Amino acid sequence: MAKLEDFIKAKEKLSKVLLETHLIYSPIFSKESGNKVFIKPENLQKTGSFKIRGAYNKISNLTDAEKKRGVIASSAGNQAQGVAYGAKESGIKAVIVMPKSTPLIKVESTKQYGAEVILHGDVYDDAYKKAKELEEKEGYVFVHPFNDEDVLDGQGTIALEILEELPETDIILVPIGGGGLISGIACAAKILKPEIKIIGVEPEGAASAYEAIKENKVVELKEANTIADGTAVKKIGDLNFEYIKKYVDEIITVSDYELMEAFLLLVEKHKIIAENSGILSVAATKKIKEKNKKVVSVISGGNIDVLMISSMINKGLIRRDRIFNFSVNIPDKPGELAKVVDLIAELGANVVKLEHNQFKNLSRFKDVELQVTVETNGSEHIKNLVQAFEEKGYEIIKIKSKVN
């Protein structure tokens, strides 16, 4: 098990490459959770995630002989950039094996840090096997993304920074993928402040740590199904399992829909864009039982595909009842469509989409179906809108307010 001096040494080494990520107080997540919530924005690191901490600490602890051999890693995202940047800053060779399906932007970002990129296989497991083959064949040093003591020590420096800036922290919420981040943070935090509570957060569709604790052994999930792809890990590290058992107080899960809602609030209220895995801890603030505590949520990364941003925002708006989809039957005669639009306008809602389908068969042959999407101010606004339609004699026949 790691000792305090291991984390302190790691912090000293990392001072050369880290951006100091100060805590950000969140009024919105504080209000919704009944606690004082602070955000630790690791998405602002140079490589876009916390991974540089563990990768650089691992590389800096290599012997001169090992550094001459160079390092190798397998990744489709944050680990690739962390290892590539860490190797560049240390002046050594880095080879990163990535699946062929890796988005071009991530491949190019990794290359920009000077790493040699090898595209191999269709999924991460294929890339991992190839990296291990090259480790054996070429003599590279493999940098594991989470199941490694030096990596764990690097990640744990986050806890040192949190407790230095906010010593009265009661709870730290940490995303869990393979388990390296929470292992380091939990160990360091408990050494410094034994009474602190550490809560791990996993996606519902990839809760490998939760299942491991429940079974009291490392288990492999049949599948990992979640939009939080960075934490879609079927099996946590065995080393990390021991740390989690000893230092983590609780593990909770959040749904993809809760992630969408948290994403929207981060963008709208904090102007922060983070990846789905990175916001697990923020999404979990509403699910903790404690009240009136000082809570720190670690945003672990911000490397999100730009094409996903609009989808996350739109689904978050639906989740918050800010977008309302419904269908209503109206008489098929001139002026009826205008009446509906005028009624919506009177109620202060904004039409986003309107589809007037005259050819859909209805039980009442003189009616047509009108499909409407409007922007609203929330649940109460929707309730008023539905009531107003009913008072005018319209029947809303299909309501799709939530995404769950």
Model-identified regions with their sequence ranges:
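PLP-dependent amino-acid enzyme catalytic core
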Residues: M1-N404
